[in-house]
């Protein structure tokens, strides 16, 4: 029973980590390798607002998410828009931006020990005899809400429909008067905010360091590749597969093999089905 419960929590954590990465790639076909750094940046902003500026918890989160979304838009407008369509340059450029953000955090003094913030809700409950703290339930709830919100946003709002149109056929969308670069900037900004939302939701479970961005990026990429780049249903399914795999690894082998499992999932997927579980082979061939 503990595998079932904690596997669900781990899956929600991975889904939260990956949904922003999936959104950006699905719309702009841009692999944002600064995703992990944006996650870390948001976590440290919340920590600073709470412990240095003594802001209200909710206000600290809102300000941090707004600032992270602005940073995402700036990254796109100042760099990525100039190299869009050049796959190698996109990967190298976005990864370099991520490294710069993490070095900025180190320069600001976030080095050495790990940093922590309190949970939203204290206390615990029992599910099927398995003790689960309320913060983990918040993560599961947040994952469900975010997936539902994104589906409603992309199906019932003007901007969301425009984003879907650009994702499905960029040339046709531009012929209808849509600004492809503007839509990509919006997706990058929203993806950055989602990375930040994952941080503020997951951060209270433990602690965060500057290096946390690397592991978040690895897990986000693993989920997206296994599920199919740009596929939200695929990302959710892949999050459950890897999440439960990590739980079983932790229970029967050792917790430090969880990252190995994620990397192994990437390798196996690229060998057996390069387009991923829900990816489209035709789109993959067009990219290659």
What are these regions (language model features)?
Residues 88-89, 168-182, 253-288:
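Cytosolic-side transmembrane-helix boundaries in multi-pass membrane proteins
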């Amino acid at each position: 029973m503990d595998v079932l419960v904690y596997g669900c929590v781990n899956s929600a954590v991975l889904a939260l980590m990956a949904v922003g990465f999936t959104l950006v790639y699905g719309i702009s076909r841009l692999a944002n390798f600064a995703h992990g750094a944006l996650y870390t940046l948001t976590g440290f902003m919340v920590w600073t607002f709470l412990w240095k500026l003594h802001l209200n918890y909710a206000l600290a989160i809102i300000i941090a998410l707004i600032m992270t979304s602005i940073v995402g838009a700036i990254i796109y407008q100042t760099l990525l828009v100039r190299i869009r369509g050049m796959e190698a340059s996109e990967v190298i450029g976005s990864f370099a931006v991520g490294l710069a953000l993490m070095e900025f955090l180190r320069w600001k003094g976030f080095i050495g020990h790990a940093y922590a913030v309190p949970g939203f809700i204290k206390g615990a409950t029992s599910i099927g005899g398995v003790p689960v703290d309320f913060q983990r339930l918040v993560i599961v709830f947040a994952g469900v809400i975010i997936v539902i919100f994104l589906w409603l946003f992309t199906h019932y709002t003007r901007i969301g429909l425009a984003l879907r149109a650009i994702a499905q056929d960029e040339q046709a969308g531009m012929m209808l008067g849509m600004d492809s670069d503007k839509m990509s900037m919006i997706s990058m900004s929203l993806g950055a905010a989602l990375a930040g939302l994952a941080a503020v939701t997951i951060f209270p479970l433990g602690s965060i360091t500057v290096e946390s961005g690397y592991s978040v990026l690895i897990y986000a990429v693993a989920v997206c590749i296994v599920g199919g780049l740009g596929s939200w249903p695929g990302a959710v399914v892949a999050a459950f597969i890897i999440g439960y795999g990590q739980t079983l690894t932790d229970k029967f082998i050792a917790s430090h093999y969880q990252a190995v499992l994620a990397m192994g999932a990437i390798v196996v997927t690229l060998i057996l089905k390069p387009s991923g579980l829900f990816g489209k082979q035709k789109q993959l061939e067009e990219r290659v």
